């Protein structure tokens, strides 16, 4: 449980996350906090470099929010972008153990080997700490309800019935056209009790529409609306450009005078 003078927030990680972070108990709270903030900052820099984004993307509001809150989000995204080979498989496995929704991009891009390893490590934590899982599953309903309350419904469409179905349809349509984009955008669009920093998952498939709208801190459905607009434009852009080019060609002086 985290407490500040203005609010109380409870730990919402799974037992897998708890087991993975257990070695942090070797450090004092201050030491681990400092180390984690440094790791998060290095992750933010790595993300920008690997995606070949301008350095000012470090000021992307969801990234800034993830940094000052010390959330594992940036570490998870960095691990998912770590690349191919054995190191990439290990990184993906750790990412999913830290945040279960990290499996969504792997599922969308059909990476069975990485999914199996990730699920294997998670299942191994059941053997290591079965009592944690028993307690977690027993209290899962209460934990989920508390998380919904403390996140004020989150930023995704999950708790907005009017937006949920059209957003899900948009992600499915996008998946048929671009699996990578659908996998990265599904989490900020649909994951329950999502936070502002979840929008950092859009960075690998960023567009101008997403860059502008996802920078705005708003919990009234802006994130799913932004993603639906982006999906619409991904489908409409080529036909619109083709039509505009045809109109421009028809209106050009050479065409008119021939």
Region roles according to the model:
Residues 92-95, 101-110:
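Transmembrane-embedded, aromatic-rich helix segments that form part
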Residues 1-89, 111-258:
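Primarily membrane-embedded glycan-assembly and transfer machineries that use lipid-linked glycans
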């Amino acid at each position: 449980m985290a407490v500040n003078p203005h609010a109380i927030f409870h730990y919402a990680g799974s037992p897998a996350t708890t087991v993975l972070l257990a070695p942090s108990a070797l450090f004092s709270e201050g030491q681990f906090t400092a180390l984690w903030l440094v790791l998060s900052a290095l992750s933010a820099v790595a993300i920008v470099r690997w995606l070949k984004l301008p350095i000012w993307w470090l000021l992307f509001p969801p990234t800034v929010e993830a940094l000052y809150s010390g959330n594992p989000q940036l570490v998870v995204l960095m691990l998912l972008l770590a690349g191919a080979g054995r190191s990439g498989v290990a990184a993906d496995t750790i990412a999913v153990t830290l945040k279960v929704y990290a499996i969504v991009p792997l599922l969308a891009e059909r990476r069975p080997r990485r999914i199996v390893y990730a699920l294997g490590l998670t299942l191994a934590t059941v053997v290591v700490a079965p009592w944690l899982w028993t307690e977690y599953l027993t209290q899962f309903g209460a934990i989920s309800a508390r998380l919904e309350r403390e996140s004020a419904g989150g930023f995704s469409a999950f708790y907005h019935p009017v937006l949920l179905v059209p957003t899900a349809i948009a992600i499915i349509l996008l998946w048929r056209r671009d699996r990578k984009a659908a996998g990265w955008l599904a989490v900020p669009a649909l994951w329950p009790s999502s936070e502002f920093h979840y929008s950092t998952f859009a960075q690998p498939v960023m567009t101008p529409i997403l860059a502008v709208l996802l920078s705005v801190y708003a919990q009234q459905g802006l994130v799913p609306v932004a993603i639906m607009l982006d999906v619409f434009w991904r489908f409409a852009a080529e036909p619109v450009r083709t039509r505009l080019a045809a109109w421009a060609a028809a209106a050009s002086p050479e065409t008119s005078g021939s």
